[in-house]
Regions:
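Ser/Thr-glycine-rich phosphate-binding loops at phosphate-binding pockets of nucleotides
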Residues: 154, 158-159
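Cys-dependent protein tyrosine phosphatase-like superfamily
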Residues: 1-149, 162-263
Length: 263
Protein backbone atom coordinates (compact mmCIF):
# COMPACT_ATOMS: atom_id res chain seq x y z
CA UNK A 1 0.00 0.00 0.00
CA UNK A 2 1.19 3.53 -0.73
CA UNK A 3 1.88 5.85 2.21
CA UNK A 4 -0.28 8.91 2.87
CA UNK A 5 1.75 12.11 3.22
CA UNK A 6 -0.14 14.67 5.29
CA UNK A 7 0.00 18.34 4.34
CA UNK A 8 -1.96 21.38 5.45
CA UNK A 9 -3.64 21.96 2.10
CA UNK A 10 -2.60 19.26 -0.35
CA UNK A 11 -5.09 16.44 -0.71
CA UNK A 12 -4.63 12.74 -1.37
CA UNK A 13 -0.83 12.90 -1.43
CA UNK A 14 0.81 9.49 -1.44
CA UNK A 15 4.29 8.03 -1.75
CA UNK A 16 4.20 4.78 -3.74
CA UNK A 17 7.30 3.61 -1.91
CA UNK A 18 6.97 0.29 -0.13
CA UNK A 19 4.52 -1.33 -2.53
CA UNK A 20 5.75 -4.87 -3.19
CA UNK A 21 6.15 -6.26 -6.71
CA UNK A 22 5.41 -9.81 -7.79
CA UNK A 23 9.13 -10.66 -7.70
CA UNK A 24 9.49 -9.51 -4.09
CA UNK A 25 11.15 -6.17 -4.75
CA UNK A 26 9.62 -2.96 -3.40
CA UNK A 27 9.14 0.50 -4.86
CA UNK A 28 11.83 2.82 -3.49
CA UNK A 29 10.37 5.38 -1.05
CA UNK A 30 10.75 9.06 -1.85
CA UNK A 31 10.76 8.64 -5.63
CA UNK A 32 7.15 8.45 -6.88
CA UNK A 33 4.47 10.70 -5.37
CA UNK A 34 0.88 11.32 -6.50
CA UNK A 35 -1.31 14.14 -5.23
CA UNK A 36 -4.03 16.69 -5.81
CA UNK A 37 -3.39 20.14 -7.26
CA UNK A 38 -0.68 22.35 -5.76
CA UNK A 39 -3.02 25.29 -5.29
CA UNK A 40 -3.28 27.55 -2.24
CA UNK A 41 -0.55 25.69 -0.38
CA UNK A 42 0.69 26.91 2.98
CA UNK A 43 4.28 28.07 3.44
CA UNK A 44 4.87 24.89 5.41
CA UNK A 45 3.54 22.77 2.54
CA UNK A 46 5.81 24.50 0.02
CA UNK A 47 8.87 24.19 2.25
CA UNK A 48 8.25 20.51 2.81
CA UNK A 49 7.62 19.81 -0.87
CA UNK A 50 10.82 21.58 -1.89
CA UNK A 51 12.76 19.06 0.18
CA UNK A 52 10.84 16.07 -1.19
CA UNK A 53 10.46 16.64 -4.93
CA UNK A 54 12.41 18.00 -7.88
CA UNK A 55 9.74 17.60 -10.58
CA UNK A 56 6.03 18.42 -10.84
CA UNK A 57 3.84 16.92 -13.57
CA UNK A 58 0.47 18.67 -13.96
CA UNK A 59 -2.08 16.39 -15.65
CA UNK A 60 -5.00 18.86 -15.55
CA UNK A 61 -6.67 20.68 -18.42
CA UNK A 62 -5.75 24.21 -19.43
CA UNK A 63 -9.02 25.50 -17.95
CA UNK A 64 -8.27 23.90 -14.59
CA UNK A 65 -4.72 25.22 -14.60
CA UNK A 66 -5.96 28.74 -15.38
CA UNK A 67 -8.63 28.64 -12.64
CA UNK A 68 -6.31 27.23 -9.97
CA UNK A 69 -2.64 27.55 -11.00
CA UNK A 70 -0.04 25.50 -9.17
CA UNK A 71 1.94 27.32 -6.52
CA UNK A 72 5.64 27.52 -7.30
CA UNK A 73 7.77 25.06 -5.35
CA UNK A 74 11.40 26.29 -5.30
CA UNK A 75 13.93 23.96 -6.85
CA UNK A 76 11.45 22.00 -8.95
CA UNK A 77 10.85 21.65 -12.66
CA UNK A 78 7.30 21.90 -13.98
CA UNK A 79 5.75 19.89 -16.82
CA UNK A 80 2.23 20.54 -18.12
CA UNK A 81 0.85 17.29 -19.59
CA UNK A 82 -2.96 17.46 -19.85
CA UNK A 83 -4.12 13.88 -20.34
CA UNK A 84 -7.69 14.72 -21.32
CA UNK A 85 -9.07 17.26 -23.74
CA UNK A 86 -12.66 17.77 -24.86
CA UNK A 87 -14.08 14.61 -23.25
CA UNK A 88 -13.11 15.68 -19.75
CA UNK A 89 -16.56 16.16 -18.15
CA UNK A 90 -16.53 13.95 -15.09
CA UNK A 91 -12.75 13.98 -14.80
CA UNK A 92 -11.97 17.68 -15.03
CA UNK A 93 -12.79 19.88 -12.03
CA UNK A 94 -13.18 23.02 -14.14
CA UNK A 95 -16.27 24.87 -12.93
CA UNK A 96 -18.43 24.37 -16.03
CA UNK A 97 -17.56 20.70 -16.27
CA UNK A 98 -18.60 19.99 -12.67
CA UNK A 99 -21.86 21.94 -12.92
CA UNK A 100 -22.91 20.23 -16.15
CA UNK A 101 -22.12 16.78 -14.84
CA UNK A 102 -23.96 17.26 -11.55
CA UNK A 103 -27.01 18.63 -13.35
CA UNK A 104 -27.19 15.58 -15.62
CA UNK A 105 -26.41 12.81 -13.18
CA UNK A 106 -27.30 13.98 -9.68
CA UNK A 107 -30.33 11.65 -9.40
CA UNK A 108 -28.87 8.80 -11.48
CA UNK A 109 -26.30 6.72 -9.55
CA UNK A 110 -26.01 4.00 -12.19
CA UNK A 111 -25.57 6.60 -14.90
CA UNK A 112 -22.91 8.30 -12.78
CA UNK A 113 -20.96 5.08 -12.34
CA UNK A 114 -21.20 4.23 -16.03
CA UNK A 115 -20.14 7.75 -16.97
CA UNK A 116 -16.95 7.55 -14.93
CA UNK A 117 -16.24 4.04 -16.17
CA UNK A 118 -16.45 5.31 -19.74
CA UNK A 119 -13.86 7.97 -18.91
CA UNK A 120 -11.40 5.28 -17.82
CA UNK A 121 -11.97 3.45 -21.08
CA UNK A 122 -11.25 6.65 -22.98
CA UNK A 123 -7.85 6.86 -21.30
CA UNK A 124 -7.04 3.74 -23.32
CA UNK A 125 -8.95 4.36 -26.54
CA UNK A 126 -7.85 7.99 -26.92
CA UNK A 127 -4.54 8.18 -28.78
CA UNK A 128 -4.10 11.67 -27.33
CA UNK A 129 -4.38 10.41 -23.74
CA UNK A 130 -1.99 7.55 -24.47
CA UNK A 131 0.60 9.90 -25.91
CA UNK A 132 0.34 12.11 -22.83
CA UNK A 133 0.74 9.19 -20.44
CA UNK A 134 3.71 8.17 -22.56
CA UNK A 135 5.21 11.63 -21.97
CA UNK A 136 4.63 11.17 -18.24
CA UNK A 137 6.61 7.93 -18.32
CA UNK A 138 9.43 9.57 -20.29
CA UNK A 139 9.89 12.02 -17.44
CA UNK A 140 10.06 9.12 -14.98
CA UNK A 141 12.85 7.66 -17.13
CA UNK A 142 14.96 10.79 -16.57
CA UNK A 143 17.39 11.01 -13.67
CA UNK A 144 16.01 12.74 -10.57
CA UNK A 145 17.68 13.71 -7.31
CA UNK A 146 14.39 13.72 -5.45
CA UNK A 147 10.85 12.51 -6.11
CA UNK A 148 8.66 13.11 -9.13
CA UNK A 149 5.20 14.33 -8.11
CA UNK A 150 2.27 14.11 -10.50
CA UNK A 151 -1.18 15.49 -9.88
CA UNK A 152 -4.56 16.31 -11.35
CA UNK A 153 -7.24 18.24 -9.45
CA UNK A 154 -7.82 16.00 -6.42
CA UNK A 155 -5.48 13.14 -7.33
CA UNK A 156 -8.27 10.71 -8.15
CA UNK A 157 -8.79 9.80 -11.82
CA UNK A 158 -5.96 11.09 -14.01
CA UNK A 159 -3.29 10.93 -11.32
CA UNK A 160 -4.77 7.65 -10.13
CA UNK A 161 -4.54 6.17 -13.62
CA UNK A 162 -0.93 7.34 -13.91
CA UNK A 163 -0.22 5.57 -10.63
CA UNK A 164 -1.93 2.40 -11.87
CA UNK A 165 0.18 2.45 -15.04
CA UNK A 166 3.54 2.83 -13.32
CA UNK A 167 2.59 0.33 -10.59
CA UNK A 168 1.64 -2.22 -13.22
CA UNK A 169 4.89 -1.63 -15.14
CA UNK A 170 6.82 -2.15 -11.90
CA UNK A 171 5.11 -5.49 -11.37
CA UNK A 172 2.79 -4.65 -8.49
CA UNK A 173 0.05 -7.34 -8.32
CA UNK A 174 -3.36 -6.33 -9.65
CA UNK A 175 -5.14 -6.73 -6.31
CA UNK A 176 -2.63 -4.49 -4.56
CA UNK A 177 -3.06 -1.90 -7.33
CA UNK A 178 -6.85 -2.00 -6.96
CA UNK A 179 -6.71 -1.80 -3.16
CA UNK A 180 -4.45 1.23 -3.34
CA UNK A 181 -6.61 2.86 -6.02
CA UNK A 182 -9.66 2.58 -3.75
CA UNK A 183 -7.90 4.24 -0.79
CA UNK A 184 -8.77 7.56 -2.43
CA UNK A 185 -12.25 7.13 -0.93
CA UNK A 186 -10.73 7.27 2.55
CA UNK A 187 -8.43 10.19 1.81
CA UNK A 188 -11.04 12.39 0.09
CA UNK A 189 -13.90 12.05 2.57
CA UNK A 190 -14.02 15.79 3.23
CA UNK A 191 -13.95 16.64 -0.47
CA UNK A 192 -16.76 14.16 -1.13
CA UNK A 193 -18.84 15.58 1.72
CA UNK A 194 -18.48 19.06 0.20
CA UNK A 195 -19.63 17.81 -3.21
CA UNK A 196 -22.65 16.05 -1.69
CA UNK A 197 -23.60 19.25 0.14
CA UNK A 198 -23.10 21.24 -3.07
CA UNK A 199 -25.39 18.91 -5.03
CA UNK A 200 -28.10 18.97 -2.38
CA UNK A 201 -27.94 22.76 -2.29
CA UNK A 202 -28.12 23.06 -6.07
CA UNK A 203 -31.12 20.74 -6.29
CA UNK A 204 -32.79 21.84 -3.04
CA UNK A 205 -33.30 18.15 -2.31
CA UNK A 206 -32.22 15.56 0.24
CA UNK A 207 -33.00 12.59 -2.01
CA UNK A 208 -30.69 9.64 -1.08
CA UNK A 209 -29.96 9.17 -4.79
CA UNK A 210 -27.91 12.36 -4.65
CA UNK A 211 -25.37 10.94 -2.21
CA UNK A 212 -25.09 7.71 -4.20
CA UNK A 213 -24.50 9.62 -7.43
CA UNK A 214 -21.94 11.94 -5.86
CA UNK A 215 -20.01 9.00 -4.41
CA UNK A 216 -19.68 7.54 -7.89
CA UNK A 217 -18.80 10.88 -9.50
CA UNK A 218 -16.36 12.18 -6.90
CA UNK A 219 -15.05 8.98 -5.35
CA UNK A 220 -13.46 5.87 -6.78
CA UNK A 221 -15.04 2.52 -7.53
CA UNK A 222 -13.57 -0.87 -8.38
CA UNK A 223 -15.54 -0.86 -11.63
CA UNK A 224 -13.49 2.11 -12.88
CA UNK A 225 -10.14 0.38 -12.71
CA UNK A 226 -11.73 -2.80 -14.06
CA UNK A 227 -13.02 -0.74 -17.01
CA UNK A 228 -9.48 0.52 -17.59
CA UNK A 229 -7.94 -2.96 -17.55
CA UNK A 230 -10.76 -4.31 -19.73
CA UNK A 231 -10.13 -1.57 -22.29
CA UNK A 232 -6.41 -2.40 -22.30
CA UNK A 233 -7.22 -6.04 -23.05
CA UNK A 234 -9.75 -5.12 -25.73
CA UNK A 235 -7.47 -2.76 -27.61
CA UNK A 236 -4.03 -4.28 -27.02
CA UNK A 237 -4.56 -7.86 -25.87
CA UNK A 238 -2.05 -7.69 -23.02
CA UNK A 239 -0.60 -5.05 -20.74
CA UNK A 240 2.86 -5.72 -22.18
CA UNK A 241 1.57 -4.80 -25.63
CA UNK A 242 -0.14 -1.74 -24.12
CA UNK A 243 3.21 -0.61 -22.69
CA UNK A 244 4.92 -0.93 -26.05
CA UNK A 245 2.28 -0.09 -28.66
CA UNK A 246 0.13 2.23 -26.56
CA UNK A 247 2.62 4.07 -24.37
CA UNK A 248 5.64 3.86 -26.65
CA UNK A 249 7.99 2.10 -24.24
CA UNK A 250 10.75 -0.23 -25.39
CA UNK A 251 11.87 -3.33 -23.52
CA UNK A 252 14.90 -1.37 -22.31
CA UNK A 253 12.64 1.47 -21.10
CA UNK A 254 10.60 -0.95 -19.01
CA UNK A 255 13.75 -2.51 -17.57
CA UNK A 256 15.20 0.92 -16.78
CA UNK A 257 12.04 1.94 -14.92
CA UNK A 258 12.26 -1.22 -12.84
CA UNK A 259 15.94 -0.66 -12.13
CA UNK A 260 15.32 2.96 -11.10
CA UNK A 261 12.30 2.46 -8.88
CA UNK A 262 12.57 -1.05 -7.41
CA UNK A 263 15.02 -2.45 -4.94
Amino acid sequence: MSTLLKFDNLSNTRDLGGMVSSDGRTIVPGKLIRSGQLYNLTESDIKRLSGLIDTVIDLRTEDERREKPDDVVPGTGYHFIPVVASFSEGVSRAVGSVENMVARLVFNPEGARNHLGSMYRKFVFSDYSLSQYGRFLRILLDDHDRAVLWHCSVGKDRAGTAAVIIEKILGIPDQAIIDDFLKTNDYLKEDLARMIAYAKSKTDSDDPLIEQSMRYLFGTDRSYIEAFFSAVNERFGTFDTFERAGLGLSDSDVERLREKYLR
